[in-house]
């Protein structure tokens, strides 16, 4: 195999999906520890001590202890090169989180075993479903009193509609947590407290029968019964089913104590796919093609207070990036020279000399690049599957100075191109309605309108709870629909027709009465 193909085969590009506080940032830190990317793992919540999680680096994040922006971290592990895209887990997350999942080849789902499957996890799993992304699951926090592990598997299968294949099994929980049993290698790994900040060689015992004394007779007997149950009732791991997104291997442990993380990472690097082929409008692009192609899935503003810049995050789909190369911007038809592409280690910028399929690199963007833009070495190629997601929270924008209407509109359209929020212009009023996926987005937009566009605005409530993009192949039916529902219709920032529903019932009735109209919760960029 050539050096070029080896580089691609090594890459594993994935994101972590979880509900806020399920332990995602902690598990990220432990992975970086195993990848020698950091020396000691800083516990994330210990704000007073001044130890901040490596992956939470924007000022707002440092203040709140949450990850708002998507950082990208690259580190080596097990002969692979891991590209980990950290996604915001907090309530105040944005479409960025959803869109990041379009740039990965697999995902790690972290479940808080005390609480089980939660709302945010369900939403993120639905996004993974759009592309049948392979999912690995880590059941976290077994050093606490958790739910019954069989019940947890049942919940994942019923709510998330994916088969579970446990790879190991917890021995006890909470203060009686003794470790995990590897179901495929007949090996017990014993748990000890106090090793959360280091890589610790936890004791292993080959053969379940040999671990009887170490775990105690009562737990041993319970474990034997549970293992029989699990083997009878759960699914065997099947690599093909996993790669098709139908089955998830499940690992148990506690990220805070750095226990069970290594086993999960070993499994992940073994089974998760290398960079996959990608669909473009014109054809399917294979990862091992020689020419560079890729797409922008995120634009991040002001990543550096000193530079006041915007960075476009670019997923390489094929070929090799080399410093100083010229690339073709498909939407504008222009050539661009990329002299300073960046790679990130959560706020630590480094200039990158080369990049391969699966890698994420950053371009400086002076306003010409939008989310969803494709770049090639000359071929007219537009990648599919970088969606806009329907917002879930809406507010009316109130301008403090009416003379600044033009600046406000310009600012909102530019910020919506960046994916920060979406702006809607209703048919029957001059008001602008702003939509976002998380509450924090409204603060971010107001802050940036003031600092970058010199426009001060405030928000007030608006009678909108849902938005759906409208598509119809029959022009006459579409025009009839527009006349009949003009009070609910608006155009978004990119000029797409949108239905703004005051209630879920209103939307349902409109859908039932208009079977030829497509009401879509996503649209392509």
From Swiss-Prot:
UniProtKB keywords: Cytoplasm, GTP-binding, Nucleotide-binding, Protein biosynthesis
Coiled-coil zones: none
GO cellular component, one term: cytosol
Binding site for GTP: 18-25, 86-90, 140-143
Lineage: superkingdom: Bacteria
Compartment(s): Cytoplasm
InterPro entries: EF-G-like_DII, EFG_III/V, G_TR_CS, P-loop_NTPase, PrfC, RF3_C, RF3_dom_3_sf, RF3_GTP-bd
GO biological process: regulation of translational termination
Extent of the signal sequence: none
Residue ranges of domain tr-type G in the record: 9-276
NCBIfam families, per database record: prfC, PRK00741.1, small_GTP
HAMAP family: Rel_fac_3
Family: Belongs to the TRAFAC class translation factor GTPase superfamily. Classic translation factor GTPase family. PrfC subfamily.
Functional description taken from the UniProt entry: Increases the formation of ribosomal termination complexes and stimulates activities of RF-1 and RF-2. It binds guanine nucleotides and has strong preference for UGA stop codons. It may interact directly with the ribosome. The stimulation of RF-1 and RF-2 is significantly reduced by GTP and GDP, but not by GMP.
Protein name: Peptide chain release factor 3
């Amino acid at each position: 195999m050539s050096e070029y193909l080896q580089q691609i085969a090594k890459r594993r590009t994935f994101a972590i999906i979880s509900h806020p506080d399920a332990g995602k940032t902690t598990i990220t830190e432990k992975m970086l520890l195993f990848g020698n990317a950091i020396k000691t793992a800083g516990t994330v919540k210990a704000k007073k001590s001044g130890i901040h999680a490596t992956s939470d680096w924007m000022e707002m994040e440092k203040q709140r202890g949450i990850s708002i922006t998507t950082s990208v971290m690259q580190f080596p592990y097990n002969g692979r090169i891991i590209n980990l895209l950290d996604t915001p887990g907090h309530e105040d997350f944005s479409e960025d989180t959803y869109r990041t999942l379009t740039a990965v080849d697999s995902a790690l789902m972290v479940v808080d075993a005390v609480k089980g499957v939660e709302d945010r996890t369900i939403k993120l799993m639905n996004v993974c479903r759009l592309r049948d992304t392979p999912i690995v699951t880590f059941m976290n926090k077994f050093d606490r009193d958790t739910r019954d592990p069989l019940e947890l598997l049942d919940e994942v299968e019923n709510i998330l509609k994916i088969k579970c294949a446990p790879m190991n099994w917890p021995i006890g929980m909470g203060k009686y947590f003794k470790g995990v049993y590897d179901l495929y290698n007949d090996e017990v790994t014993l748990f000890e407290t106090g090793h959360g900040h280091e890589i610790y060689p936890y004791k292993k015992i080959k053969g379940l029968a040999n671990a009887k004394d170490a775990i105690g007779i009562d737990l041993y007997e319970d474990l034997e019964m549970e293992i029989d149950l699990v083997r009878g009732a759960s699914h065997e791991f099947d690599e093909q089913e996993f790669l098709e997104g139908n089955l998830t291997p499940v690992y148990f442990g506690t990220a805070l104590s750095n226990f069970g993380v290594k086993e999960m990472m070993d499994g992940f690097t073994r089974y998760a796919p290398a960079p996959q082929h990608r669909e473009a409008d014109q054809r399917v692009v294979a990862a091992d093609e020689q020419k560079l192609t890729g797409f922008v899935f995120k634009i991040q503003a002001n990543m550096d207070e000193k530079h006041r810049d915007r960075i476009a995050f670019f997923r390489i789909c094929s070929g090799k990036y080399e410093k100083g190369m010229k690339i073709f911007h498909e939407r504008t038809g222009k050539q661009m020279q990329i002299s300073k592409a960046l790679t990130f280690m959560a706020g630590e910028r480094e200039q990158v000399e080369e990049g391969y399929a699966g890698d994420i690199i950053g371009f400086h963007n002076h306003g010409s690049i939008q989310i969803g833009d494709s770049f090639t070495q000359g071929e007219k190629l537009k990648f599919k599957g970088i969606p806009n997601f329907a917002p879930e929270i809406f507010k009316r924008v109130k301008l403090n100075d009416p003379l600044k209407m033009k600046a406000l509109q310009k600012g909102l359209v530019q910020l919506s191109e960046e994916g920060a929020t979406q702006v809607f212009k209703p048919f029957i009023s001059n008001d602008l309605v702003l939509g976002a996926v998380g509450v924090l987005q409204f603060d971010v937009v107001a802050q940036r309108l003031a600092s970058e566009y010199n426009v001060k605005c405030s928000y007030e409530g608006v009678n909108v709870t849902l938005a759906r993009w409208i598509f119809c192949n029959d022009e006459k039916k579409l025009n009839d629909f527009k006349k009949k529902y003009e009070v609910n219709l608006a155009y978004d920032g990119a000029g797409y027709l949108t239905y703004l529903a005051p209630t879920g019932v209103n939307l349902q009735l409109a859908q039932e009465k208009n079977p030829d109209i497509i009401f879509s919760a996503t649209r392509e960029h």
